[in-house]
Amino acid sequence: MGFRGKYFFPILMTLSLFLIIRYNYIVSDDPPLRQELPGRRSASSGDDITYTVKTPSKKTKRLFHTAVTATDSVYSTWQCRVMYYWYNRFRDEPGSDMGGYTRILHSGRPDGLMDEIPTFVADPLPSGVDKGYVVLNRPWAFVQWLQQAHIEEDYILMAEPDHIIVKPIPNLARGNLAAAFPFFYIEPKKYESVLRKFFPKENGPISRIDPIGNSPVIVTKNALMKIAPTWMNVSLAMKNDPQTDKAFGWVLEMYAYAVSSALHGVSNILHKDFMIQPPWDTETKKTFIIHYTYGCDFDMKGKMMVGKIGEWRFDKRSYGDKPPPRNLTLPPRGVPESVVTLVTMINEATANIPNWES
């Protein structure tokens, strides 16, 4: 049987039990937060660190709190700065239900953006647990944030650093129904045999699993507090199951959230206009968010160059070690409006963010 067969699942269960025990400890001992600036250590708390979350003074049941998980890498940092710039631009505009904002930093230590962006510092998973798949830290970071931070709003928008808000976002959720973007590559029916390991038949038809990830999603705070620890444990279990890990690859954590939402009976209103992903989506007119996950490569006549390095290009992966320069060259005539808007909005943000290239 070997080490894997004899000891693998006991070790996994021990780790999951440790995380659940820690989560339950946090729930039972939820201390009030001191009113300090985001990221400041409490002088009287010894080894404990508490963080405040800035929220607006107005309070309505329809406000949502925007939460963005991130690391302290240069790659993540510049995207967070652009994202936060556009959040601030639209937060108080007519039609907005946008409340407070938190960057959930799961690197385990404060970084250079603590005074620029409201930030909660979360502990990462123990070394080696993520197996190089860093987004496994996301659900564990949400568990910590939901239980340690004081969040005034009744709803949460889970977003990502590479999201640009293009207009005020209303609360798209309705009652107990969350609101989410449907991803074409999340296919529960296709992978039913794999998903049944985590969503048994007694939980209902596989169609109860929505074709979503955890972002963008607007969900009630109370529902997310129930979903998050399940999302954490399902993510770990999926990553440690070779068949599931191979089937889902880099979208594994997205499937884990979709399963966890279904396990807790939280259905989602699917909004295809919630977000667009250039260059494949060509217009921004109806959308709320640009997700620049794909590279944009075009020739100088405006024709897309699929699978090739473009004569003109924008790809966030080109800026892993340093932020993009100010005043990026705009795309040539004929390139989709969504790509032009993306680059224009990045240029506006970088022109107005102090000390950008530092």
Curated annotation (Swiss-Prot):
GO cellular component, one term: membrane
Tissue expression per record: Ubiquitous.
InterPro entries: HPAT-like, HPAT/SRGT1-like
E.C. code: 2.4.2.58
Catalyses which reaction(s): trans-4-hydroxy-L-prolyl-[protein] + UDP-beta-L-arabinofuranose = O-(beta-L-arabinofuranosyl)-trans-4-hydroxy-L-prolyl-[protein] + UDP + H(+)
Keyword Transferase: yes
Location(s) in or outside the cell: Golgi apparatus, cis-Golgi network membrane
Domain of life: Eukaryota
Disruption phenotype: No visible phenotype. Short-root-hair phenotype. Hpat1 hpat2 double mutants have longer hypocotyls, are early flowering and show early senescence in leaves associated with a decrease in chlorophyll content. Hpat1 hpat2 hpat3 triple mutants fail to produce detectable levels of Hyp-arabinosides, have low fertility and shorter pollen tubes.
GO molecular function, a single term: hydroxyproline O-arabinosyltransferase activity
Primary subcellular site in the record, as a coarse category: Golgi
Segments crossing the lipid bilayer: 7-26
Pfam families membership: HPAT
Membrane topology designation: Single-pass type II membrane protein
Alphabetized UniProt keyword annotations: Glycosyltransferase, Golgi apparatus, Membrane, Signal-anchor, Transferase, Transmembrane, Transmembrane helix
Function of the molecule: Glycosyltransferase involved in the O-arabinosylation of several proteins including extensins and small signaling peptides. Catalyzes the transfer of the initial L-arabinose to the hydroxyl group of Hyp residues. Contributes redundantly with HPAT1 and HPAT3 to arabinosylation of EXT3.
Protein name listed in UniProt: Hydroxyproline O-arabinosyltransferase 2
Phylogenetic classification of the source organism: Eukaryota, Viridiplantae, Streptophyta, Embryophyta, Tracheophyta
